[in-house]
């Protein structure tokens, strides 16, 4: 009997640690569904692993396993932060890994909340799994200004189901991915219960029908390209190393690089675009340079956009900005209306919360240019070559609702300027590009992305890359890109239809549960 008890305890012990192993492996696998790997089916594999551990009968095991899943997922998924914290923030490698782990542990709270709610409400329905996940992802993208990085919907941009995005956005695509994974999970679980043959068949049929309809939705085009309004755009990629970018001794070298890239293309293209904070000094300090740029642009009829660091002379705010030169309707001047100022700033990168307390603690809280202030949440379009551009600077492009709110009736293009040199040769810039592509697909507008070290691209209104410059070289990329006319359902309604459907699913599920309880009592 003692031997039998030992065997049973050993099996129980092994089962628990097998669950932990499944959690870590499936969490890590989830990252391979995102760019640059793009193995999109692994999103479903990762979520199946999460559902397996979340449904563990013992709540404490389920919660710990979910934490391990999330640590594997987020530690690997945001590992690119090590580059900026260690190499450019001056933190030791140990401190850098600790801070990334701390962020991952915080982000793990949201999947753990998912598991807690699944256990608390004894969830079995696939659609309710998706509703709860949508709630926790909403919270992750909102609390403390939000960090909606690594949403599973992004992995599906190159899958057969990408057509969901123009209707329900990346949130809807995430909902579908979780729902489909939950249906598969319930399907596999039902196979081991002979009494549930009808449930097996119902789940299989439902998955086939909805999966087929979702794949078919990719054939629906809500917008069309207007080729006769195409303009030639040149992206100037200076490839300035981040450790040199803010070095005062390298300023004139940076200026010379961009002067050369601009001069080579003046008169040969309609519009030249430089990346985020292209020139590492206050725009106000080199006003004569921009006045010269204005004259050259007007003479050659090539308009220019530049990412700058600008101090508003009225408010005194330090702003991450985009200015234009050569526009006959908006001549260059520091306080021109034809300017965009970044609204959604990067915590600790562009501003430091609790600044007076944190800055003295460690050099990691003293990154270059970490004292910006926010521009308005909704701003006018930038105008160049009689075309309207809806801008987002760097990190802002991951906030789909903010980008949607800045879309105007006359918007021709989405524009994003970035400096991904902060993240070196890591997976970060590729994930960032994938999210930018999703904005184009959701809103049905072509996207232009100008960066310092790459990845500079032109993207069509279906989220497909039209032209791409290599990373880490000084170069220009020119493409004749046409605007798109029409509206996607998501561009008009945003996330409200999905949230309304989620609420409806919850109400129906609650009503059915109530009816079942009443019938059992009777």
UniProtKB/Swiss-Prot annotation:
Q: Answer yes or no on keyword Glycosyltransferase.
A: no
Where is it predominantly found? membrane
CDD domains per UniProt: ALP_N-acyl_transferase
Compartments, record wording? Cell inner membrane
Q: Which domain of life is it from?
A: Bacteria
Instruction: Identify the residues that the record assigns to the CN hydrolase domain, covering every copy.
Output: 236-483
Q: What class of enzyme is it?
A: transferase
The annotated active site, in chain numbering, is 276, 342, 394
The portions of this protein that span the membrane are 17-37, 61-81, 98-118, 127-147, 164-184, 197-217, 495-515
This entry carries the following GO cellular component terms, namely:
plasma membrane
**Membrane topology type:** Multi-pass membrane protein
EC number(s) recorded for this UniProt protein: 2.3.1.269
The UniProt record lists the keyword ATP-binding: no
Q: Name one GO biological process term.
A: lipoprotein biosynthetic process
Q: Kindly give the NCBIfam families that the UniProt entry links to this protein.
A: lnt
User: Main role?
Assistant: Catalyzes the phospholipid dependent N-acylation of the N-terminal cysteine of apolipoprotein, the last step in lipoprotein maturation.
What PANTHER family does the annotation carry?
A: APOLIPOPROTEIN N-ACYLTRANSFERASE
Question: What is the protein name for this chain?
Answer: Apolipoprotein N-acyltransferase
Q: Which gene encodes it?
A: lnt
């Amino acid at each position: 009997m003692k031997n039998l008890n030992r065997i049973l305890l050993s099996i129980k012990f092994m089962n628990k640690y097998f669950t932990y192993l499944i959690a870590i492996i499936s969490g890590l696998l989830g990252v391979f569904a995102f760019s640059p790997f793009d193995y999109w089916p692994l999103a479903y594999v990762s979520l199946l692993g999460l559902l397996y551990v979340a449904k563990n009968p013992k709540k404490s095991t389920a919660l710990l396993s979910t934490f391990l899943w999330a640590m594997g997922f987020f530690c690997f998924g945001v590992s690119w932060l090590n580059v900026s914290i260690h190499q450019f923030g001056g933190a030791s490698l140990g401190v850098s890994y600790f801070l990334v782990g701390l962020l991952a542990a915080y982000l793990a709270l949201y999947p753990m909340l998912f598991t807690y709610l699944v256990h608390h409400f004894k969830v079995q329905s696939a659609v309710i799994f998706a509703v709860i996940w949508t709630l926790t992802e909403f919270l992750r993208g909102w609390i403390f200004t939000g960090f909606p990085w690594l949403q599973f919907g992004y992995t599906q941009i190159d899958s057969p189901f990408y057509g969901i995005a123009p209707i329900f956005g990346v949130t809807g695509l995430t909902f579908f991915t979780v729902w489909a994974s939950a249906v598969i999970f319930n399907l596999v679980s039902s196979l081991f219960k002979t009494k549930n043959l009808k449930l097996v068949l119902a789940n299989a049929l439902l998955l086939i029908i909805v999966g087929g309809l979702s794949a078919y939705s990719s054939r629906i085009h809500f917008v069309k390209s207007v080729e006769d309004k195409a303009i030639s755009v040149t992206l100037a990629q200076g490839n300035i190393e981040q450790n040199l970018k803010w070095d005062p001794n390298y300023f004139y070298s940076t200026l010379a690089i961009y002067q050369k890239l601009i001069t080579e293309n003046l008169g040969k293209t309609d519009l030249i675009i430089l990346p985020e904070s292209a020139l590492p000094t206050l725009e106000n300090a080199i006003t004569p340079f921009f006045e010269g740029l204005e004259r050259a642009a007007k003479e050659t009829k090539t308009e220019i956009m530049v990412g700058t660091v600008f101090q508003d002379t009225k408010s005194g705010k330090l702003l991450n900005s985009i200015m234009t030169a050569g526009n006959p309707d908006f001549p260059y001047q520091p306080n021109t209306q034809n300017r965009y100022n970044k609204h959604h700033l990067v915590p600790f990168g562009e501003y430091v919360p609790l600044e007076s307390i944190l800055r003295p603690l460690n050099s990691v809280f003293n990154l270059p240019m970490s004292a910006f202030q926010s521009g308005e949440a909704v701003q006018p379009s930038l105008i160049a070559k009689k075309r309207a551009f809806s801008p987002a600077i760097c990190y802002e492009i991951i906030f789909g609702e903010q980008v949607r709110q800045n879309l105007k009736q006359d918007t021709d293009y989405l524009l994003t300027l970035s400096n991904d040199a902060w993240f070196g040769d890591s997976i970060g810039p590729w994930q960032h590009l994938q999210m930018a592509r999703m904005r184009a697909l959701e809103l049905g507008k072509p996207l232009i992305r100008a960066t310092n070290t790459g990845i500079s691209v032109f993207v069509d209104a279906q989220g497909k890359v039209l032209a791409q410059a290599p990373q880490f070289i000084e170069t220009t990329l020119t493409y004749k890109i046409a605007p798109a006319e029409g509206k996607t359902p998501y561009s008009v309604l945003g996330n409200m239809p999905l949230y309304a459907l989620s609420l409806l699913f919850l109400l129906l599920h609650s009503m059915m549960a109530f009816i079942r309880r009443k019938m059992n009592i009777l």
